[in-house]
Amino acid sequence: MRKLILQMQMSVDGFVGSDEDRRWQLWEWGDDSAWDEELKQDFNAVFTTLGTILLSRKMVEEGYLTHWGNAAKKYPKDRFYAFAQRIVEAEKVVASDKLAASRWERTRVVSGDLPREVDALKQGDGGDIAVFGGAGFASALIAAGLVDEFQLFINPAVLGSGRRIFDKSGFARLTLLGSKPYACGMVVSRYAPAQ
């Protein structure tokens, strides 16, 4: 069975989004990144294991697919942007009750019962499934017990307030799969729900 992997940028105090419009992530997904080379390599390594990318409707409408499609074209030989090419090539699934059909290449829309749709994806063939979306989408997946692995990219920032992913429901206990600090100040911690 394929794993559902939730990747989230997070502040040291556990927020995944700021209430104010301020830059706090080491990389805000633009052309300039404060990530060090080792972090970039490790980030790309995750994408080599993926078969499917699950996205929230909002993430797609805010330009996720267009942005990374453009990055793949703009930086075709840049090793750091190899993940962008993988996003273009991978199957994408958008969870939405509002979109009727996909207008993006290699992308389909699923609606209705989210746990049923995710279970069907997990039963499918291919590599693991990465999830990208906002706090609400991530919280819904967590509350439904659908996440098999958390990859938390903990930025060296304290927000004090904002959006969290574990407020609605969380796991009473997580098992640490690994944690790695990087020279740029990022710590990537990987957890699985305790059995």
Question: Where does each model-flagged region fall?
Answer:
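Enzymes that bind and transform nitrogen-containing heteroaromatic metabolites
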Residues: 1-195
